[in-house]
Amino acid sequence: MDWKTLQALLSGVNKYSTAFGRIWLSVVFVFRVLVYVVAAERVWGDEQKDFDCNTKQPGCTNVCYDEFFPISNIRLWALQLIFVTCPSLLVILHVAYREERERRHRQKHGDQCTKLYDDTGKKHGGLWWTYLLSLVFKLLIEFLFLYLLHTLWYGFGMPRLVQCANVAPCPNTVDCYIARPTEKKLFTYFMVGASAVCIVLTFCEICYLIFHRVVRSLHRKRQPGGRGHAPSASRASTCRCHHKLLEAGDLSPDSHDNKLCASAPTMTPI
């Protein structure tokens, strides 16, 4: 993935995000992606080459390295960045589905017909649930990778000395030394802190979406017409459009599209 593709992806996600979502994208791009590209490879580039052990036994150093680093930190963070940004694609795909559905509707019934959606990118109906589901996935992914990072390396610290005991082909307990442990520990703390900030922002965005949904529902219930006014207007407008098509000769009286007026009240946007 090049920078242009990444920029287009982030711009598309940012277009349909809330204020918390835009801050989340900024944190991910500045404090995680850029820091990962600029500093991570330099800090962790020498991890296996400079992993020294006090033994000359062939293969012992590689086995001890694999024992302590089952997966490289830098590769784990790369997977985390990929998986944590993937749920945002659900929102983009749902909006694209709405736009295509709207295009086919206008192509079939004409430009004067009632729109299926006032705004295809507005988080109402199914898109609201898709957006909420993407946030829940982000939270789960963040917690999962933090758990893996904490479990695989026995905490977020980076010891100067590790010992390999009873590991073939090492003959006995072998002491191994990690290169630049302090720098790697500080970098690990920084990445964990960035993940924690993203978790807080995602949780705040979930609370904001739910609170805004509840307030909007209460406001609708307090209105005199309730929920019954909007379907009636939609049905009347759709029927007028249907009759115009009949007068123009674009539809036959016994065509399948005659059911459009009857089904108008049940056309719930997805």
From Swiss-Prot:
Residue stretches spanning the membrane: 21-40, 76-98, 127-149, 188-210
Key words, A-Z: Cell junction, Cell membrane, Gap junction, Membrane, Transmembrane, Transmembrane helix
Disulfide pattern: none
Extracellular side: 41-75, 150-187
GO molecular function, one term: gap junction channel activity
Subcellular location: Cell membrane; Cell junction, Gap junction
Cytoplasmic topological domain: 1-20, 99-126, 211-270
Cellular component annotations (GO), alphabetically ordered: connexin complex; cytoplasm; intracellular membrane-bounded organelle
Highest taxon of the lineage: Eukaryota
Membrane topology: Multi-pass membrane protein
Chief site of localization: membrane
Biological process (GO), any one: placenta development
SUBUNIT field: A connexon is composed of a hexamer of connexins. Interacts with CNST.
Purpose: One gap junction consists of a cluster of closely packed pairs of transmembrane channels, the connexons, through which materials of low MW diffuse from one cell to a neighboring cell.
Family classification: Belongs to the connexin family. Beta-type (group I) subfamily.
Entries under PANTHER family matching the protein: CONNEXIN, GAP JUNCTION BETA-3 PROTEIN
Stated name of the protein: Gap junction beta-3 protein
Record organism: Bos taurus (Bovine)
